[in-house]
C-alpha cells in the first residue's frame, strides 16, 4: 500500500514577464497554467518554459502561492 497522504499537489504557474509588465501596464493580462507536481521529488519552486498568449512567445512560468 502507498504511504502518506497527498504527495502530489496542484500548483499554478504564472508568466514572469507578464507580471513584471503589469506594473508598467503594457500587458493586457497574465498567463496562468495549472499542473501537478510531486512534493518529494521537487521540493523547490517549479519553473517551466511555456507559451504566453499575451506576450506571443515562450517565456518562463514560475510557481506561485495560492
From Swiss-Prot:
Keyword Plastid among UniProt keywords: yes
Major localisation: plastid
Source species, domain of life: Eukaryota
Gene3D superfamilies referenced in this protein's UniProt entry, alphabetically: Ribosomal protein L33
InterPro entries hit by this protein: Ribosomal_bL33, Ribosomal_bL33_CS, Ribosomal_bL33_sf, Ribosomal_zn-bd
Stated family: Belongs to the bacterial ribosomal protein bL33 family.
Protein name: Large ribosomal subunit protein bL33c
